Amino acid sequence: MAAGSTEDAGRPLVIALVVDTAGNEGNGTSNSALQYAKELRRQGHTVRLVGIGSPEYPIRVRHIPLVSWIAAKQQMQFAQPDRAMFRKAFEGADVVHVYLPFKYGRMAVRTAHEMGIPATAGFHLQPENVLYSAGPLRYIPGASAFIYWLFNRMLYRHIWHIHTPSHMIAAQLRAHGYRQRLHVISNGYSPRFTAKQQREPGSPSPRPFRIVASGRLASEKDHVTLIRAVALSRHAEDIELTICGTGPLQHELRRMAGKLLPGRWSIGFHDNAQMPELLRSCDLLVHPSIVDIESLSVLEGMASGLVPVIARSTQSAAGQFALNDHSLFEAQDPAMLAQRIDWWIDHPDELSRWGAIYAEHTREEYSIASCVRKFVAMEREAIADFDGRL
């Protein structure tokens, strides 16, 4: 379809999704891209997934000294820009959507524009996350503002339509001078995550009481606070804690859990295919993260019928999911989190009632089908707006 044309406005689109790692469901950004690709196809669109691990448009890994080693601990790889592969993947496409602002994504946008194809981009990498991975650099005044500026300079200034997964990150972009058209669209959750059967009214609190958390085992996800809170709980001996993820703090968290927790615990990687069953087997979801653009793991837990207890942090959008005060605690406050955990254990009927409420709310507001329809509307708007200039 010609740029700016409104002809065949409702026809299926050919969309190229450009993501560094396209075959890794353990990485949040890749997981989102794979979910969107699957749902786009289900809705009748043609998707060309371009990236490392893609079966149709595979890209080689780009090795950056030290940086790649650190990124690998977060299940993240950098893709090597490949103009020839981009031209092959983009031929006949209606629009190109890029997920990350690195050299690979920049070349994808440049190639698309050279071919007369509009490009959009998602803002999935929070600068605060980058700084937490960089250790003491996060304490440098103005460091996060510089990264917001740098990302805009690197990629987003060449893009008019930007997908932001939450209102929080959209507000951050506005505060840091982004003047583009921002589309707040949740990443959504897979329909594989269905609600568990809640316990009958009057049933006692389960023993063991299973608490689950999911996320990278890194400092900004603050699983340290969760472990300390479980240790402080009046029901500590009855709690079974599962933390799903991999990352640089895995060994440290295991040592801490072994020292502090009297009950059973498990910390480590869980295959994405096993997550729906695991979540339905648990009783409470805790999300202690300090930094989050949205948090897919909270959506998946709520869709599974779990009540969430979420850290309230100015750098995290996850708190938006809380429907009552008992689902919130102040970030990095293990005593307050322990109180929240104890309240839910002491009120099993409320736990069941709110579990059903959270499941229904999530199904209505955050289904992948509705999110992808909004995404397609953004892409159609970008196609109509495109004037062929870089």
Language-model regions, residue ranges each:
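Carbohydrate-associated surface elements
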Residues: M168, G188
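Short hydrophobic beta-strand element within catalytic cores of glycosyltransferases
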Residues: V307-A311
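Conserved donor-binding/catalytic core segment of Leloir-type glycosyltransferases
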Residues: A16, G202-L232, T242
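Aromatic "clamp/platform" in nucleotide-sugar-dependent glycosyltransferases that forms part
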Residues: P101, I290
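Short alpha-helical donor nucleotide-sugar binding micro-motif in glycosyltransferases
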Residues: F90, F269-H270, E277-C282
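Conserved acidic donor-binding segment of nucleotide-sugar-dependent glycosyltransferases
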Residues: L323-A335, W343-P348
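Nucleotide-activated donor-binding/catalytic signature segment of Leloir-type glycosyltransferases, i.e.
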Residues: H251-A273
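Membrane-proximal helix-turn-helix segments that form the acceptor-binding/catalytic region
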Residues: E114, Q126, A143-H161, H176
